């Protein structure tokens, strides 16, 4: 849907996000890097696309009914927020199961959209949230799990929207895409579309260094919320990929801060991981002159309570009202004068 016209429903606001070249972070790397700014979706993340498509597809198949079906879904946060948003639009009660390690902002946003939140043991990661969702479905009347990790409507959303948008916005000149793997929908859907358009396009999944299950390594705790669930999702099409890239949590956090500082892009930790991976690829000699596209998955405000903004949060909490002299002193220190 064009953003130049008035729309009738909130669902029509989803998609057609801007593609922005990283002029500072991408400078002198050999290849160019551009990001799809997915926090421009109405519920501020890439997951808006799949939540809407999964509900729409299930409705058309007669699997769910507004005002009757209760939607239950395991999530690390952004999918839950998107589903709460789309569920509210379409007339559904929504219950989300989520590891207790996810940020407080996620819980607040879910509640703000009218969803119920059930926290699960963080030690069991997303697998524990999946199990709890299934247990709830079995005892709640008219409950239905859309199952982002196994639902073909997830990658289909990206095949129908994100992939074509990237192709159009780059005028078919995209060479490489890389995306963090949570449910695997972006990598699979975008990769499938672009490879149909140009088989030479390379697709790279991205996972936390600490939880590199696609690379055959064990899952362990990490700080990149929304990625590295500890399992390989059913919808992830491994045949599309050139190589699974690994990004350390601390590097992802540092890059998220760098995005805000140098490019004025306030994204989350997974967005930092995506750009870290893009920088890895841009530095490879064989990619000189190529165009690499990734996503800024979600808006940074929902990460204020995480390790990403720990120092700033402590600073803000300790701020005090100042007199004029101290105000001038602080202002001069900030300006370096």
Swiss-Prot record:
Alphabetized UniProt keyword annotations: Amino-acid biosynthesis, Cysteine biosynthesis, Lyase, Pyridoxal phosphate, Transferase
EC number(s) on file: 2.5.1.47, 4.4.1.9
Entry keyword annotation includes DNA-binding: no
Modified sites of kind N6-(pyridoxal phosphate)lysine: 47
Induction of its expression: By hydrogen sulfide or cyanide. By morpholin-4-ium 4-methoxyphenyl (morpholino) phosphinodithioate (GYY4137).
Catalytic activity line of the entry: hydrogen cyanide + L-cysteine = 3-cyano-L-alanine + hydrogen sulfide + H(+); O-acetyl-L-serine + hydrogen sulfide = L-cysteine + acetate
Cofactors demanded by this protein: pyridoxal 5'-phosphate
Gene Ontology terms: cellular component: cytoplasm
Residues binding pyridoxal 5'-phosphate, per UniProt: 78, 182-186, 270
GO terms assigned for molecular function: cysteine synthase activity; L-3-cyanoalanine synthase activity
Gene3D superfamilies referenced in this protein's UniProt entry, alphabetically: 3.40.50.1100
InterPro entries for the chain: Cys_synth (IPR005856), Cys_Synth/Cystath_Beta-Synth (IPR050214), CysK (IPR005859), P-phosphate_BS (IPR001216), TrpB-like_PALP (IPR001926), TrpB-like_PALP_sf (IPR036052)
GO biological process: cysteine biosynthetic process from serine
Family: Belongs to the cysteine synthase/cystathionine beta-synthase family.
Assembly information from the UniProt record: Homodimer.
Biological role: Primarily catalyzes the formation of cyanoalanine and hydrogen sulfide from cysteine and hydrogen cyanide. Can also catalyze, although less efficiently, the formation of cyanoalanine and hydrogen sulfide from either S-sulfocysteine or O-acetylserine and hydrogen cyanide and the formation of cysteine from either S-sulfocysteine or O-acetylserine and hydrogen sulfide. By catalyzing the assimilation of cyanide produced by P.aeruginosa, mediates resistance to infection. Involved in fertility, growth and aging. Does not mediate survival in high levels of hydrogen sulfide.
Name of the protein described by the UniProt record: Bifunctional L-3-cyanoalanine synthase/cysteine synthase
Source organism: Caenorhabditis elegans
């Amino acid at each position: 849907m064009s953003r130049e016209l008035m729309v009738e429903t909130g669902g029509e606001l989803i998609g057609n996000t801007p593609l922005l070249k990283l002029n500072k972070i991408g400078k002198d790397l050999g290849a160019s890097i551009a990001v799809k700014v997915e926090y421009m979706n109405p519920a501020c993340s890439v997951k808006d696309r799949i939540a809407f498509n999964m509900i729409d597809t299930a409705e058309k198949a007669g699997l769910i009914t507004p005002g009757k079906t209760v939607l239950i879904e395991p999530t690390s946060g952004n999918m839950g927020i998107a589903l709460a948003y789309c569920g509210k639009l379409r007339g559904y009660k929504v219950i989300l199961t989520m590891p207790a390690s996810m940020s407080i902002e996620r819980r607040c946003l879910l509640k703000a959209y009218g969803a119920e939140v059930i926290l699960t043991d963080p030690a069991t990661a997303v697998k524990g949230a999946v199990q709890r969702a299934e247990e709830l479905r079995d005892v709640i009347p008219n409950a239905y799990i859309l199952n982002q990790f196994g639902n073909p409507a997830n990658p289909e959303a990206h095949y129908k929207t994100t992939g074509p948008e990237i192709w159009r916005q780059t005028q078919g000149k995209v060479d490489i895409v890389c995306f963090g793997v949570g449910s695997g929908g972006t990598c699979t859907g975008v990769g499938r579309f672009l490879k149909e358009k140009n088989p030479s396009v390379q697709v790279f999944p991205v996972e936390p260094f600490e939880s590199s299950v696609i690379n055959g390594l064990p899952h362990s705790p990490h700080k990149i919320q929304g990625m590295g669930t500890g399992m390989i999702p059913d919808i992830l099409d491994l045949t599309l990929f050139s190589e699974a890239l690994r990004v350390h949590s601390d590097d992802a956090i540092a890059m998220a801060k760098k995005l805000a500082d140098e490019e004025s892009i306030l994204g989350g930790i997974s967005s930092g991981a995506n750009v870290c991976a893009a920088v890895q690829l841009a530095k490879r000699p064989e990619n000189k002159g190529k165009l690499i596209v990734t996503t800024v998955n979600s808006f940074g405000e929902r990460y204020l309570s995480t390790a990403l903004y720990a120092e700033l949060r402590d600073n803000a909490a300790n701020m005090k009202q100042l007199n004029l002299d101290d105000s001038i002193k602080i202002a001069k220190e900030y300006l370096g004068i």
